[in-house]
Regions:
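Carbohydrate-associated surface elements
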Residues: 171, 193
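N-terminal subdomain of nucleotide-sugar transferases
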Residues: 1-60, 106, 160, 192
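A short, well-ordered alpha-helix in the C-terminal region of glycosyltransferases
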Residues: 265, 344, 351, 358-385
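Conserved acidic donor-binding segment of nucleotide-sugar-dependent glycosyltransferases
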Residues: 327-331, 335-342, 351-357
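Acidic donor-binding loop of glycosyltransferase active sites
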Residues: 282-297, 314
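Nucleotide-activated donor-binding/catalytic signature segment of Leloir-type glycosyltransferases, i.e.
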Residues: 251-275
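Conserved donor-binding/catalytic core segment of Leloir-type glycosyltransferases
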Residues: 203-230, 242, 287
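Short hydrophobic beta-strand element within catalytic cores of glycosyltransferases
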Residues: 306, 311, 315-318, 328
Length: 389
């Protein structure tokens, strides 16, 4: 039997995780699902109740402490000694979570555990393997591998014990193989998947609608997009721009819009349910995501919104960051510009707005490319080979 362990599930910003689980269910593979934390309380998650109700969420507070103590008492003498040695360390809770979850995995007959992100859940899986000898695999994404951390159990320890590491882009896979050459053979590239049939292109609205979606954080480059919109407005280009999402830079971005006098052109639309995002993609002229590499190494790798835009037959304006160039073929399915360059971004936007035939050609080719490399059916079947299912 297969199980999944998440730090938090369901979670609004991780639709790719839900899609993976839903496709496994469609393929008649029904993993047990464990979540270390309570589910996301963001916008409405219109997800299959059969999946959401199947999630085993860990108890909190005293209830968890009591159950974890009971589970820990059944561990081997060596495992109990390890628990004692780790008492008081920053990550000691992971060991108690491993004792609690591992005991339940054993009762369920789970032979393989899969985890997304090399963070809290992966460190818990490390200890589950240590205490219960249950094999695990890991899908890594972006900040969990690009940004250095000082966890007591880090990537080196995880990579030395994991059965397989799934990188969601060739860019990330090469980085990991270079950094962890001793375990390079364990690294596999499998893209996140999407069902393109859930995203249908429609006639774009007028005036041109520039759509951008993501958390309002520095690496997304929304400041660059707003500055590019100011350049478009100053050049008398008619357009609207909607930025969907929320985050710590919301107030800064609103102030930037007001400083440029873009209140009539640019809207911070806040978070929106997935169904509404799909509808807005179908009405947009293009997707813009001028992402950048942060000072700490944080960057996008395989932005889900670009997959969704391509599935919606939208041309994309972005940058050559992480795995974006594997998604957006420059001059074929969209336009790639340099990071932190609002002038080049504005020119790319203007080119697509003023040349609808080119934009439509890019969009059609982008949808074909998405169907080819992001097929949820094909990519989940590749995952199942790693799970030996």
């Amino acid at each position: 039997m297969l199980a999944y362990l998440f730090e938090r599930f369901p979670k609004f910003s991780q639709t790719f995780c839900y899609r993976e689980i839903a496709e496994l269910f469609r393929q008649d593979v029904r993993p047990a699902i464990f979540s270390l934390r309570a589910p996301d309380r963001g916008p409405e998650l219109n997800w299959d109740p059969a999946i959401v109700s199947a999630v085993h969420q860990l108890p909190e507070g005293d209830a968890f402490a009591r159950l974890a103590d009971e589970a820990s008492a059944t561990l081997s003498r060596a495992a109990r000694r390890t628990l004692h040695e780790w008492r008081g360390k920053d990550d000691s809770l992971r060991l108690h979570q491993a004792a609690y979850i591992g005991a339940r995995l054993q009762k369920l007959g789970v032979r393989h555990l899969h985890v997304h992100f090399a963070g809290m859940a992966a460190r818990t899986a490390f200890w589950i393997k240590r205490f219960f000898e249950i094999e695990y695999s890991l899908t890594v994404h972006a900040n969990d591998i690009f940004v250095p951390n000082n966890f007591e159990i880090g990537l080196l320890q995880i990579f030395s014990t994991v059965r397989a590491v799934v990188a969601v882009s060739d860019f990330a896979a090469k980085q990991l193989r270079d950094r962890f050459s001793d375990t390079a053979s364990r690294v596999h590239r499998i893209y996140n998947g999407i069902d393109c049939d859930n995203f249908q292109p429609a006639e774009p609205s007028r005036p041109a609608l520039i759509l951008s979606i993501g958390r309002l954080i520095n690496k997304k480059g929304f400041d660059v997009l707003i500055d590019a919109c100011a350049s478009l407005r100053n050049g008398n280009q008619e357009f609207r721009c909607e930025i969907i999402g929320e985050g710590p830079l919301s107030a800064d971005m609103q102030a930037r819009i007001e400083r440029h006098g873009l209140g009539k052109q640019v809207l911070l639309a806040g978070p929106r349910p997935q169904a509404e995002i799909a509808a807005r993609l179908s009405r947009a002229t293009l997707l813009a995501l001028p992402c950048r590499v942060d000072a700490d190494g944080a960057m996008d790798n395989l932005p889900t919104v670009i997959m969704e835009a391509m599935a919606s037959a939208l041309p994309v304006v972005s940058t050559d960051v992480g795995g974006v160039a594997e998604m957006v073929r420059n001059g074929e399915t969209g336009l790639l510009v340099n990071q932190n360059d609002p002038i080049a971004t504005a020119e790319a936007l203007r080119r697509l707005i003023t040349n609808p035939e080119l934009a439509q050609s890019f969009g059609r080719k982008g949808r074909e490319h998405a169907k080819e490399i992001f097929s949820i059916d094909k990519n989940v079947r590749a995952l199942r080979q790693i799970f030996a299912l």
